[in-house]
């Protein structure tokens, strides 16, 4: 029996981070967490591309464009969608989630999901590492694991 499991090893990996500028107080924390994880696991600065987009709705479009180029081993999608007083939150959260899921099925480049959905700014900041855990760090770890697992599967 053979068992395949991704590793948290970044040497030689090229990673793209697509990040929303909207809610930047939160997304900058997510970016810091993702960069911390990548650097701790040997991904060199010159192998990290950070692409800023206006808002969460633009993340899937640019993520797909980058994935289709197949120049990165994994892509990390980072953003923060915070509930307001209208139905807009539900639309944005659902469409961004569906968009990233579709890219993962369509294009052969793993995309990790580091998009926070929360009811308040305080909740979003907490999930971005202000109190504990950083979803950007976690998304980067998923990207490393999936990139390495993909390499193993390709070698079968």
Curated annotation (Swiss-Prot):
Q: Name one GO biological process term.
A: riboflavin biosynthetic process
- The record's active-site residues are 88 (proton donor)
Q: Name one GO cellular component term.
A: riboflavin synthase complex
- Tell me its family: Belongs to the DMRL synthase family.
**Which UniProt keywords are present, listed alphabetically?**
Riboflavin biosynthesis, Transferase
Q: Which reaction does it catalyse?
A: (2S)-2-hydroxy-3-oxobutyl phosphate + 5-amino-6-(D-ribitylamino)uracil = 6,7-dimethyl-8-(1-D-ribityl)lumazine + phosphate + 2 H2O + H(+)
Any idea what this protein is called? 6,7-dimethyl-8-ribityllumazine synthase
Encoding gene per record: ribH
Which pathway features in its UniProt record?
Cofactor biosynthesis; riboflavin biosynthesis; riboflavin from 2-hydroxy-3-oxobutyl phosphate and 5-amino-6-(D-ribitylamino)uracil: step 1/2
Say what the protein does: Catalyzes the formation of 6,7-dimethyl-8-ribityllumazine by condensation of 5-amino-6-(D-ribitylamino)uracil with 3,4-dihydroxy-2-butanone 4-phosphate. This is the penultimate step in the biosynthesis of riboflavin.
One Pfam family cited in the UniProt record for this chain: DMRL_synthase
> Which InterPro entries does the protein's record reference?
LS, LS/RS, LS/RS_sf
């Amino acid at each position: 029996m053979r068992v395949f499991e991704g590793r948290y090893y970044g040497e030689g990996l090229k990673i793209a981070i697509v990040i929303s500028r909207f809610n930047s107080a939160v997304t900058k924390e997510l970016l810091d967490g993702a960069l911390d994880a990548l650097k701790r696991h040997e991904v060199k600065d010159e192998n990290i591309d950070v692409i800023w987009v206006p808002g969460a709705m633009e993340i899937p479009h640019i993520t797909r464009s980058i994935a289709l180029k197949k120049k990165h081993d994994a892509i990390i999608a980072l953003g923060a969608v915070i509930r307001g007083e209208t139905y807009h939150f539900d639309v944005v959260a659902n469409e961004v989630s569906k968009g990233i899921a579709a890219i993962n099925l369509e294009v052969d480049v793993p995309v990790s999901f580091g998009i926070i959905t929360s009811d308040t700014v305080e909740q979003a900041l907490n999930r971005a590492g202000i109190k504990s855990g950083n979803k950007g760090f976690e998304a980067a770890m998923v990207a490393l694991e999936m990139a390495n697992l993909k390499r193993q599967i390709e070698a079968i």
